[in-house]
């Protein structure tokens, strides 16, 4: 710990020691804080003494267990610690003590893992997760953790928590995430007092700061007479985690590898090691340091340590971005005039009276893209497109939306032009995507992306293929370019979607919605957003470390529509309606070990103690085969280095009350991970309801266009469950068996217990009256007209399958015409929903006043 550094830094800044801010239990009705705050919290000294375990059964049938305990507290230490190994013993006793310094602002969960050491490695017997908020300051706490009730296996640990002498420190927090000040260490290698270099080798220094953003860095040792600039190094680290710069002197040798290839294999030998206590260095001043490496060897470094405690380069908060708020002010004027005309109002509405309407397009590849063109055309013909504030989509719908927004005035001109251009690309051959010229283009573009530091995946290649499918030429556009299309409020505000997933969990088990807009990219769950121009750049602890060019939109289109980034389990889930049930036998168990009768355990922000018992390496191998994703888009994690707030479980988007949900495992959540794994939002819910339902957007009416071939109400049912888990107002979805058998063109859902619930107008993709009507009220007459309308969308040999990207012209126009017609044919229901949304909005305004 930076024992001396923190008091000096705090003294320089003259921070008031305000003490810890305790957040009270609240209803899960919205974000805790709309904006970030600076808060001051104390430090605590934690002593963990691992005493003993009893009745432990190992994995070796011929001998007793060789036990040791690993302790991991990632909010206080960059690496795990462990006890010694007690060999061949069922009742091992350690009596080993470990010391930590923890910060009062963050959620500190200690992981205690019991291992059985064997020749080839270590077998995990059990894992305990213990929320340190269970401890009372100043009171020793001896805890016996049950590991197996059947044979009385137990682990005994003693905790002592004391108020630290280190002064309290200030953090930036939004009530879910916490940003500590960032420590930057910069240095230059000035020379060394080591022996001369060997004839067949070269010496280099390896420098590392545990927990730093940067990996260990190798610096070549050069003679003082050698020209050129001296080698430099830089590290960024959370000062709560690291206190020391480690220096190792390495000798690099070259050995000839035996075999016909005669390749050279690099070998290194450690000649010495040393380190520098970072707290011994003055802040903001360059310091000359000499590091002893042992046996008379030393190296000279010039170092400067600085603390970054100013504003962040990302936004922590649950309010809308400035760009979106400015858009809303302008868009309300457009919507007000449109509503006056559509509903026949005597005068235009005041800005506070204008209801918020969102159009949501589901996933479905080319089918969804083509259908959304038709739905939007229908809204435009009815004069309803200007009543829409938000336009959002999943997967294929995002392809339609992102193409439209190439024109900053797209909604103000007839959509026939964009539809005709889309038809040209959808109905043309895609063989050119695999031409020699295009393959060279893909190789070149992916090479540029990889050299810029990005982790290139199959989804990046898919993005280049999507670029060809949509435009058949290079598209230089970036998402931030679309700011021009919303600056005056002339179009609805576009919200593109993806979900951050785990590589070995289904989207239904864990998916964090990530929104992409012209102004910001971010996670509403965490209240963390970066400017769109910075997506893909490297941030750590909320600070920009490495600026990268904003990715072209084709890479985002590939991510938004990456339906193939799935696992075998998810394939069965989507095709058969249920996952692979036999996998449950291979999963480990999770049990609650709390004694809920103890009064200190009733803190609503405290996570209950959980015991995880794995099934073994073979079971894990089986799970990996069936649950691992084929691919995902790996992006720099802009939340990396941030910590979870001590009361994060009160956040609206967290379901940590489900003890087995990943939200209840804070050490594994996104801020603790190096990369984001972003995939098609359809893996969670095949329509972007969660982003439209954010309380800060206050959507009154949702026009839901579902372009799936089957289960026309699945997205509504899944959204209903999603909202129920999180306490989000949503109407009751009640559908009769006859509608499940054969859906109608439009459904209005407005019944809800909570008056803040939005109205949902749902349009399944069905061919009902379009089959017999050329237009609303106009029946088909000629054989040609009847043949055009007489088709089954979801027949076994449907041309609208997910993996079909090329349509015949008639199939394309049928789909667009059907989607357009279903909107036009329900104009009265649309007007009724708008009027109801207006009435509810005004009623809420009056109640609020």
Curated annotation (Swiss-Prot):
Stimulated by cytosolic Ca(2+). InterPro entries: Acyl_Trfase/lysoPLipase (IPR016035), C2_cPLA2 (IPR041847), C2_dom (IPR000008), C2_domain_sf (IPR035892), cPLA2_C2 (IPR040723), LysoPLipase_cat_dom (IPR002642). The keyword Oxidoreductase does not apply. Expressed in myocardium (at protein level). Residues 306-849 form the PLA2c domain. The active site is at 395 (nucleophile), 680 (proton acceptor). One of its GO terms (cellular component) is vesicle. Has calcium-dependent phospholipase and lysophospholipase activities with a potential role in membrane lipid remodeling and biosynthesis of lipid mediators. Preferentially hydrolyzes the ester bond of the fatty acyl group attached at sn-2 position of phospholipids (phospholipase A2 activity). Selectively hydrolyzes sn-2 arachidonoyl group from membrane phospholipids, providing the precursor for eicosanoid biosynthesis. This is Cytosolic phospholipase A2 zeta. It comes from Homo sapiens (Human). The gene is PLA2G4F.
